[in-house]
């Protein structure tokens, strides 16, 4: 079985993916990791990918999906697709690639969270720069305010998590992903999970397991 996760930053996709990997034997496909490997191996696609990145340009869909296709040749089962596809064009290319391999996306899980909740979740995040553990000023407070429980390091907020930048990220995500939700919602296996302020990660995970 292959699963795709759709949801805005702060929707809990990462937490859900971790639980599915740990408890259900899935593997997560990271486009970023795949690109870095192709670049390090200096493959033709990797060289082309590096050229676009070095020029500060977006990597075209044909390059990104070419790298994904190479990975799928030997890995096309028990996968979690998160962060790919990002566009409708990528979704169609991915579907074609999987058909060639006699594989498919079995379930598309869309975690739908109101924008005001996302804003509060993300802008309230604090990170330990040493151990990378994440905290939250409301829902996951450290024992000592502003200090990591593990190593006593002062917690920081990532620049991208500032409220004004979060709003920009959420707007960009909405514009980018709305067509994907529309594309998949009429296909078999689409799961729509509404996550409100009171929904826990365990409740989302339980609902997903019940639908798989």
From Swiss-Prot:
Zn(2+) binds at residues 128, 131, 148, 151. It comes from the Bacteria. One of its GO terms (biological process) is AMP salvage. One of its GO terms (cellular component) is cytoplasm. Residues 124-161 are annotated as: LID. GO terms for molecular function: adenylate kinase activity; ATP binding; zinc ion binding. Residues 30-59 are annotated as: NMP. It catalyses: AMP + ATP = 2 ADP. Belongs to the adenylate kinase family. Catalyzes the reversible transfer of the terminal phosphate group between ATP and AMP. Plays an important role in cellular energy homeostasis and in adenine nucleotide metabolism. Consists of three domains, a large central CORE domain and two small peripheral domains, NMPbind and LID, which undergo movements during catalysis. The LID domain closes over the site of phosphoryl transfer upon ATP binding. Assembling and dissambling the active center during each catalytic cycle provides an effective means to prevent ATP hydrolysis. Some bacteria have evolved a zinc-coordinating structure that stabilizes the LID domain. This is Adenylate kinase. It comes from Mesoplasma florum (strain ATCC 33453 / NBRC 100688 / NCTC 11704 / L1).
